[in-house]
Swiss-Prot record:
Oligomeric form and interacting partners: Part of the 30S ribosomal subunit. Contacts protein S5. The interaction surface between S4 and S5 is involved in control of translational fidelity.
Cross-referenced HAMAP family: Ribosomal_uS4_B
Domain of life, source organism: Bacteria
Keyword Aminoacyl-tRNA synthetase: no
Region span, Disordered: 26-47
Name of the protein described by the UniProt record: Small ribosomal subunit protein uS4
Cellular component aspect of the GO annotation: small ribosomal subunit
Native source species: Orientia tsutsugamushi (strain Boryong)
Keyword rRNA-binding: yes
GO MF entries: rRNA binding; structural constituent of ribosome
SMART domains from the UniProt entry: Ribosomal_S4 (SM01390), S4 (SM00363)
Family in the record: Belongs to the universal ribosomal protein uS4 family.
Biased composition annotated in UniProt, kind: Polar residues: 28-39
Amino acid sequence: MTKVIKSKYKVSRRLGTSVWGHEKDAINNKNYKPGQQGNSSSISKPSDYSKHLIAKQRLKSHYGRISEKQFRNTFKIARKKSGNTAENLVGLLERRLDAVVYRLNIAPTIFAARQLVSHKHIKVNGKKINIASYRVKAGDSIELSEQAKQIPIVIGAISKKARRIPEYLAFDDEKFIGNFIRMPSSISEVPYPFDPQINLVVEFYSA
């Protein structure tokens, strides 16, 4: 197991949930923080601040450990938009190109999805985009480069029988082209492997 994978598993253990929903995630067997010797009844309950902080860290980690500056700026945009701030925030995060590639199951992890984008393996409406935070919009097509179609992890991800693609996206397995059909209609439509507690995140930045 590589140091990177170990680090990811430690994140899940530290945050108390499987942030990316991996079956091999250590949290499934060790439901306590790194360095802690098993579950202990003497551990104090988290404060309200800790609950809000953990909710924020879980969401940031789920989207590939977005920087605090970038995440905070995304929240500011969500708050300025009309409508529900929590839904706006999720909508903006789901529009990130690396997140779309991940949701389309073109890559097995959000980190692999980001690599595909940064290495110019992804096209949006026929144009190569290498910015992970690039925001796609309804109607945009997402296409793999010819080289990417031969990458083993891409082939493996696409060929999985248990692939689950959200209703707001679509993917043509033969043409290797995906579509961002629309924005998520609700937070519950987004396939988070944990309770995202978006309202706690909103409250954290609104305090």
